[in-house]
Amino acid sequence: MKARAPPPPGKPAAQNVHSEQKLPHDATLGSQQSLVHLKEALHNSTLDITVVLPSGLEKQSVVSGSRAVMDLLVELCLQNHLNPSHHVLEIWSSETQQPLSFKPNTLIGSLNAHTVFLKEKVPEEKGKPGLTKAPEKSVRLVVNYLRTQKAVMRVSPEVPLQNILPVICAKCEVSPDHVVLLRDNIAGEELELSKSLNELGIKELYAWDNRREMLRKSSLGNDETDKEKKKFLGFFKVNKRSNSKAEHLGLSGADSDEDPSKSASGGDLNGCVTTPNSPSLHSRSLTLGPSLSLGNISGMSMKSDMKKRRAPPPPSPGLLGQDKVSEKASLSSQADLQKKKRRAPAPPPPQPPPPSPVVPNRKEDKEENRKSTVGMEENYETDTSSLTSSVNGVSNHSLQEAIIPDSGVDDIPVTFIGEVSDEPFDSGLFFSGSNNAAALNQGGIASQRSHLPPYQTEQSQPFIRTNRKEPDPSLPSQDYRKRNQPILANTSENENPVGIDPRVTSFVSKPSTDDPKAKDKDKMCGSGPSEKTQTGHRVNSLPVNPRVGEDENSNSALPPWSHHGQASGGSYGLKYGLTTYKIVPPKPEMRCYDRDVSLSTGAIKIDELGNLMSPHMNGSRTISKPSAVAETEAPPIGKVKEFWRRNSMEKYLNGPAECTVKKAPSTTITATSEKPQRDETKAGFTLTTPEQQPASQEYGAPPEEDRSRPHSAVSCPVKVPAPNPTDITFLKPQRRTSSQYVASAIAKKMGPPKVHADVVRPHKKTAEQGHEEAKLARPPPAWKDSAVPNLCSEAGQCEHGTNQGSVRLPSNPGGQLPADHPKVEVNSTYGKSATHNSPAAVHRNSYFLPGRSSQRDRVSVGQSCGFHEKQTISNQKMNSTSNPSQALDKAHPAPLLLTEARDSGRILVNGSAQTPGNCEPPHSQKESTLTSYIILQTEEKPSPLSADGQNSDDALPSSIFGPKKKFKPVVQRPLPKDISLHSALMEAIHTSGGRDKLRKTAEQASEGRPKKPSYVEAESERSALLAAIRGHSGTLSLRKVSSLASEELQSFRDAALMAPGVDKPQQEDRGLPPPPALPPPSTPASQVPSASIPVSRFSIGTLSNPVNARQALMDAIRSGTGAARLRKVPLLV
């Protein structure tokens, strides 16, 4: 240890130091005074000295003693005419006979001077600077030593290591005897000391001290043995301490009267110390003796604290009673503290209701339980007023119950009065939108589905308890309020029960799991999404009679959610995982019902387009109804019951994964479907043929509403809602496609659609024309892959018994690309057609305008990008056999056909080719909307109903996309071709060919093989001209080539004249019509002969003369773009 600092010095020591510091000052002052006195004494004295000159001559001189030695030198040099700068004085003493040392200002009298030598200065010769040596090459050497230290030194790389070793040892402070130089500390390769750094190729090495390592190893061994000994001893010490604790705890536990293993996390905390706010599953408790008071160990909350502190001594047996009392007091205080921090426990069960029934509310319980985890079950005690038994034993409160307290009635009559939004929705999406964290109960699903949409509940049933659950939180609150307002009804204070027609009442079974029939029905429902979407089988949904009297309207009460809102203070919430949304509904709107109106006022009406019309829409839709859709009396109840029963049976037979139910093909939908039927708004299935069902049912595609004209002869898919009383549109928003959003925006922008009554024609009016249905002669080979041989013949002709139309939907042929869509041919007597549902369920309607009375509408749908080789072409023979007068002349060019078609009312319609294949997934956009050319070809003879057809063009039907506008047909006309010789030659120069290609084409034409379209021949002419132009070499060869070209052109012209005659029988053999016109630059085959014939005729008179042909070729060479490629040849003329 360091020695302590000396005490601070005292005052006497400071005085001594001060006096010591003053002594030199006094001495200097005395020496200066003595020097002055000495100067004054020497000023008067003189000295006799002998001066020896440099030449050796001695002189005697008397000098004053007060002169300085330097002044004496100058004076003597002046006397002897010497240079004082080149001479020096050397003074000798008479006593010592040696030169005295002096300073230039030393007084000569103070020196005992006897002889003064005046000598010349010897000039000091400066050494010549030698040659500059080159600096020695050195490198920075890094020396690692003691494993963690480094030293950097600059050494010569060419010197052996044994010469550098002393420098390394001095730098690292190690002894050279025990140092070994290593290349690295990993391999331990020892370096040879006879080699230099350059030879070894290193700039870093490791100096290893053998002696220090040996000492370190020995010390490490000793430390390890010491640690082992200490550890061994410490082990016994720790065990001894822990054993003492264990003995102490055991003794304290033995002294207690209660079981120390009892511990509770919530209310009973006897003998248990838990961390606050910790759940019971993860509570870390330390079991102590119950005799220990919690007041003594209130500071201990973790095990780490127990390690630091020892347990207090056990109390005396006499104080056990007092300790227990204090323990209970501390337990109650701590329990109260934890109750504030933790979630509130389950509330007490509700009391039995008084004689006037009061609806028990569990919304607050649902709000609390919604925040809990999925797997936790909270069992509540229920009284006689609640029957919430669970089939699967999960989450009893997740049901929506409909319970009558203190009653043994099995059925609850509930009347549904109100309106339903006309927008379609998918019941399959309802399950995915309302997929909660809590599991569903199969036993109470039927009651939940039946009581989910009671629009207005009679006041005569105040016992009904409805716990609602809004399944889709994605619907915003504004939209919720907007859809809620027209549904909330007037409140009536009349509590007297009203007699209700049993046909209008839907019966709801009581959710009791003891009923074996209910269990069987639950098993029939299956599992998965069908448990929620198909549980409507327990509700016998009947069509509501439109003769519901004024009693129902007058006694209509508020919906159940308004009662819950008043009772629970607006405790609304959506269950979506663990996130809670609260949507407070607006106040109910007072709606007055007129008593003196017709009986059908309260029913829901369906317009001619299939739209649902509510009596309280206040004129929001002004759709003029045709006379053919006049309101008649309601359909018989028996037929409707059978209709729904068949639907329910088909739903179970089709499998549990189906989300929509299809109607059987034997069911006929006539104009009665447009009459007021209330329960059609609660149904959600689409009438299609059985071939179209698997695609939409297997994958759960959302059904879209296809609205067709009422008396259309073509069997179109008609949207009939599913028998599901829980389908509330504001609770289950439809998953709509982008095209439907655009269509709804367009419909709102365009205004309400109008429909003419002339569009709807009865069946007899067209049957009197005496025209038969166009029968197809032979089906195309693509039919073998399709499961739909004749869609309308099964769905339309078998049902209605008349040949009203036929639809062919062939599947994709093997050679067709996936992007190419098959042809859809619709033969209709009314000139109208509607496309069918695609698997993607995108709504498309195509209305074809009626042309003439005797027309046969042949609709050829093809993809616009696949007209070259993949297009589907109708058979000419079939067309000629079905209607001989409609056979077209093959020699007419396509522009004339298009002009004629435009004049006679034939138009191009944008359609969509959609085929619901069985193997196609529903969401594949393979059958997307395509811009297709649809050519409606009619007969040429006039008809008396042409005026009606033209008048009906003015009033077009509207669809979900809004009113359809009439567009003029767009006919793609080819650009006018310049037939001048110069342009033909320039075109020949631009489009290069070759002689080889030209000859091959000529051989094919001469052999009579199947000839390519005539635009290949025009290209051959250009190739011939270009070959003639490129083949020249000078004027002589040009003349020769031009004559050859003229002969070849003549032969090509002859072949071109024969081409139409050859092409016509080939087309007749193949049965192919001339292809439609396509936009340039690819010239159609039917238009090329009309453009190429004038050119050939013009070139016959012009190119027949070889001189004119040569001149034309020369002009083309000089003025064309090919002149730059030609090489210059000297003229031989």
From Swiss-Prot:
It comes from Rattus norvegicus (Rat). Residues 1-25, 246-393, 442-568, 664-720, 942-961, 990-1018, 1063-1091 are annotated as: Disordered. It is a peripheral membrane protein. Identified in a complex composed of ACTA1, COBL, GSN AND TMSB4X. Identified in a complex composed of COBL, PACSIN1 and WASL. Interacts with PACSIN1, PACSIN2 and PACSIN3. Interacts (via WH2 domains) with actin monomers. Interacts with both PACSIN1 and DBNL. Residues 361-371, 512-524, 993-1010 have a biased composition (Basic and acidic residues). This is Protein cordon-bleu. The keyword Metal-binding does not apply. Residues 1-11, 345-358, 1072-1083 have a biased composition (Pro residues). The gene is Cobl. SMART domains: WH2.
